[in-house]
Amino acid sequence: MAGTVRNVIIIGSGPAGYTAGLYSGRALLEPLMFAGYMSGGQLMLTSDVENFPGYPQGIGGPEMMIELREQAERFGLEVHDKNVERVDLSKRPYSVWVEGEEYRSESLIICTGAESIWLGVEGEEAQKGRGISTCATCDGAFFKDCLLYTSDAADDQL
């Protein structure tokens, strides 16, 4: 792939990545996305998304990511479920390495999102997406008037 220079490479597959793919696809830029091995990111562990426009009754995170991907692919987004190993932003075209192969692009959109920090306590794995929350601002309303335990007093949890 090193000989071909793409117009747009997108790294990350959350709502921002698929929105970038949708718009660049509609602009006929033939976007290429590296979604990672866990396409959809944190929303894949989210049972109810109620704070995203267009879903008045809410939607499950995995279902939302499927819809976003299908819509972006409809407009020409090419998705590879692979992890990016490294990038070189020192010169254009930019270089992106995936599984030892170099891809080059005039534009690079990086939307890798965030990653939750898990405690590693007993039972935690089984409860991901079923009561353990890693986003107080996203999920706080679900736990109104409940007794809660927080492991981090970040500003968004207070």
Which residues does each PLM region occupy?
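Hydrophobic/small residue at the entry helix of a nucleotide-binding pocket
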Residues: 16
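Conserved catalytic-core motifs of eukaryotic protein kinase domains, centered on the activation segment
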Residues: 43-45, 120-121
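N-terminal Rossmann-like dinucleotide/flavin-binding domain of flavoprotein oxidoreductases
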Residues: 44-102
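Single conserved hydrophobic/aromatic residue that forms the stacking wall/gate
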Residues: 149-158
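FAD-binding core/adjacent interface of flavoenzyme oxidoreductases
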Residues: 1-11, 27, 32, 79-146
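Conserved acidic E/D residue at the C-terminus of a beta-strand in Rossmann-like folds
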Residues: 33-35, 152
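Aromatic pocket-lining residues of Rossmann-like dinucleotide-binding sites
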Residues: 24
